[in-house]
Amino acid sequence: MTRSLKKGPFVADHLLNKIENLNAKEEKKVIITWSRASTIVPAMIGHTIAVHNGREHLPVFITELMIRHKLGEFASTRTFRSHLKKSDKKSRR
């Protein structure tokens, strides 16, 4: 189920305050956050936000196409290790 439009998007207060302060100063710094559930809003365009994936912070550069998505969508939490190959099983018999 999607979020109600009358509530507006969820953005962590500390993250929104940092974005607004940087926009007022016209600075571009990497912002470190653990808030994967925050929605990307137009004020974030052009900033780099380092999103925590459980082990490290991954830098995500915000573009216009990312608006209304969550920050956690762009920082994968799982690593894929390839499946085992079946080449050596016959030689063991």
UniProtKB/Swiss-Prot annotation:
Gene3D superfamilies, per the entry: 30s Ribosomal Protein S19, Chain A
Pfam families referenced in this protein's UniProt entry, alphabetically: Ribosomal_S19
Protein name: Small ribosomal subunit protein uS19c
Name of the gene: rps19
Record-level Gene Ontology MF annotations: rRNA binding; structural constituent of ribosome
Compartments, record wording: Plastid, Chloroplast
Keywords: Chloroplast, Plastid, Ribonucleoprotein, Ribosomal protein, RNA-binding, rRNA-binding
GO annotations of cellular component type: chloroplast; mitochondrial small ribosomal subunit
Protein role: Protein S19 forms a complex with S13 that binds strongly to the 16S ribosomal RNA.
